[in-house]
Design a protein with these regions (language model features):
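Short "lid" loop at the C-terminus of a central beta-strand within the Rossmann-like core
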Residues: 102
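Hydrophobic "lid"/C-terminal helical patch
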Residues: 126
């Protein structure tokens, strides 16, 4: 979600072009795939490469029937594309701007300095694809801030400010999310302000 957030903060998109933080929504993203012609995805991907390696996968590079998951999420992106294909739908164009993370199992963890240092390049790679598809991007005016893609507490700076230090942080996820009882609804902190 950090690359999508950085992209959203840097560029305004025209009507009909949505920027969203898909996070780890898995199957919930199927409707998004089924309602779009072209899709640009930013994600960490296990390319089996050196950490920090940036790659762009285009439609023909993504093997939807592959059993190899390129994403650490429960329902992989390949699974979603396969589900769309079963329903008779195929994206016109697809580009995945992926980066090889240092750790794949640091759920809820911070971006490492190496990965953070590659965000600008990832954003520009994504912008290049959108422009090739005919999307006119407008840089946001200096000093303006885009509305959050999700709850503001999940934006990079606010999230990091609330994250426990390394001695207290659960390395298998962020305990702020793990302590919920199954079936317990997550309150929207924006509604309590």
């Amino acid at each position: 979600p950090r690359a999508a957030e950085a992209f959203h903060q840097r560029y305004e998109t025209p009507a009909g072009v949505d920027v969203m933080d898909g996070g780890t929504l898995g199957g919930w993203l199927l409707d998004e795939i089924l309602s779009t012609r072209r899709m640009l995805v930013f994600d960490c991907c296990d390319f089996k490469e050196k950490p920090g390696t940036l790659k762009v996968l285009q439609k023909s590079d993504v093997k939807i029937w592959s059993s190899t998951k390129i994403s650490p999420h429960q329902t992989g992106f390949n699974d979603l594309l396969a589900s769309a294909a079963i329903l008779g739908y195929e994206l016109e164009d697809l580009a995945v701007v992926g980066i090889q993370p240092e750790l794949l199992d640091d759920y809820g963890g911070s971006l490492s300095p190496l990965i953070r240092s590659r965000l600008d390049e990832a954003v520009e790679l994504g912008a290049k694809f959108l422009e090739e598809w005919g999307v006119k991007l407008t840089p946001r005016p200096a000093g303006t801030k885009a509305a959050p893609l999700s709850f503001s507490v999940l934006e990079l700076n606010e999230y990091e400010a609330g994250r426990p230090d390394a001695k207290e942080a659960c390395r298998y996820g962020d305990e702020r999310f793990l302590v919920r009882t199954a079936g317990h609804a997550v309150e929207n902190p924006e509604e309590t302000k």
